[in-house]
Amino acid sequence: MTEPRFGPAGNSESFAAAGFKKSEDAPAWLAQMGLTAFEYQCGRGVRCGEETALKIGAAAKQHGIRMSIHAPYFINLSSEESERMEKNVGYVLETARLAVPLGAVRMVVHCGGQGKLTRERAMRNSHENVRNILRALDENHLTGCTVCLETMGKK
């Protein structure tokens, strides 16, 4: 049986208060506290370079920290706009590319809100768009991460 892992999503205020500024220092800091997981946040866009991601990934491996990554928050899988969905697929692909040097095994993707759509229509769109994303990940050979859908906290 796999042991549960605990850790933060992103760097907390206590990380900065301890004098740290770089995410590559997070794995050692987390390990010192007995934590075993770290979710790299791309909530406002994928803004981490490959060199930095490699450093974070190497530090995570060295300290036994399991990595995950969070795709940008502005993704909305219930969208009916084809241009918007093309962008959403692009955001997920960017996130998946960054997951590789980070060594992330899971990629969290927000489903977004239903807006003025009925719940049924929003779910149908989301299912279709998730299939499109999975197809794009497969076509781009970016299948090393499990896609984890995260819902909003309403009804």
Where are these regions (language model features)?
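N-terminal pre-domain/capping segments
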Residues: 1-71, 75-96
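Active-site acidic/histidine proton-transfer and metal-coordination neighborhood
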Residues: 61-62, 77-155
